[in-house]
Amino acid sequence: MTNQLKEKLLAYGTKAEPFTVHNHIRVTDLQDGEARVELTLQPESLNRWGTAHGGILFALADIAAGTAVLTLRQEVCLTVNASIDFLDAAGLGSTLIAVGHVDRMGKSLCFCHTDITDETGRLLATLRT
């Protein structure tokens, strides 16, 4: 990945997509086949029990996986199937860190996994797509 592509993906994932801006999601690091995406939990990202809503965890993991693919192939990337396991909870103010990895890239399908941890390294969720 060139430095120019890295800068473009960092800017796009942080400022240009309305969903990421609205949900305070930011792309913080990129390597070939890997993307790190972060979110500090705000009140609107919580469920009725005061912990991260499953939807925000899924979105964060999916964005990390999709961005990881974009580091290798600069084409539209859509999720066709995904499975997530929710392992632990995090509350208001916690920083969630999703690291997406490309496991295999074919001509038309890519297979990825993403782990979400909090700022202490506690594993909160895993996604396979």
Which residues does each predicted region cover?
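Terminal targeting signals and extreme-terminal segments of soluble enzymes
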Residues: 1-129
